[in-house]
């Protein structure tokens, strides 16, 4: 925060201007309503999934514990950007202070990084369940699950603690207009009037590392799962194994694909319009899709939901 204060004193200004989504829309009011509905669906969908996992004894397993953690991250993730964006649209304000911008940046970096590692942990959990079913209760006991989940949150926060202070310490004298709907690192860095090429290279390496470790774990886990499934004699066993993995792979492809575009492709591929559309996808749409993917394609979750609705209807 001291760096942010010095920056503000140096430039004589304190507020950034978020150009946002609504300025480019022909129907900003309609877009606001759509985003608000998506936001409510994301919160309610993930909250219901967490409630089902907590209340139904059949869902008290490591796989569903990690799904509940993913739902918690998604609820926090969409809440970092959407409420402020909608409130600013209603109030007719598009400014964000430097400390507020830094906090938003830290939170979304932490949550995105945590989700990267959580998706890798979920792949490892599927590997142990399918390849070592007899040892699964020991290898993935409750203490191990808590340790792995805590590790995901910690490693995600490392990304936030590394990139946020450096990004916010640059002098911003070129422009204060952020061509984005929230304080994303590339959109803020481009405003600096100092040479950021070294920082951008280091940020690229950091993001490669943040993606490479989870992708390696996911790829290795699913390679071993495929080999194990190939050896199965039971067609029903193969079907069940693929069913439990397909939902997770869908989420991995959606989330990692957007992250690769944002942080690993050269700047020549980027435009403010493309960047915002990709960010809308992984910050707003992904949190609403995840609970649908994990519930509609999962018999246990759908069974728990039907049971809960039946009990409520009877009462």
From Swiss-Prot:
SS bond list: 101-193
An example Gene Ontology molecular-function term: G protein-coupled receptor activity
Keywords of this entry: Cell membrane, Disulfide bond, G-protein coupled receptor, Glycoprotein, Membrane, Olfaction, Receptor, Sensory transduction, Transducer, Transmembrane, Transmembrane helix
Membrane-spanning ranges: 30-53, 62-83, 105-124, 144-162, 200-223, 241-263, 277-296
Positions bearing carbohydrate: 3, 9
Compartmental location: Cell membrane
InterPro entries: GPCR_Rhodpsn, GPCR_Rhodpsn_7TM, Olfact_rcpt
GO BP, one annotated term: detection of chemical stimulus involved in sensory perception of smell
Cellular component, GO annotation: plasma membrane
Chain ranges on the Extracellular side, renumbered to this chain: 1-29, 84-104, 163-199, 264-276
Classification via Pfam families: 7tm_4 (PF13853)
Membrane topology: Multi-pass membrane protein
Biological function: Odorant receptor.
Family, similarity comment: Belongs to the G-protein coupled receptor 1 family.
Entry protein name: Olfactory receptor 2T5
Underlying gene: OR2T5
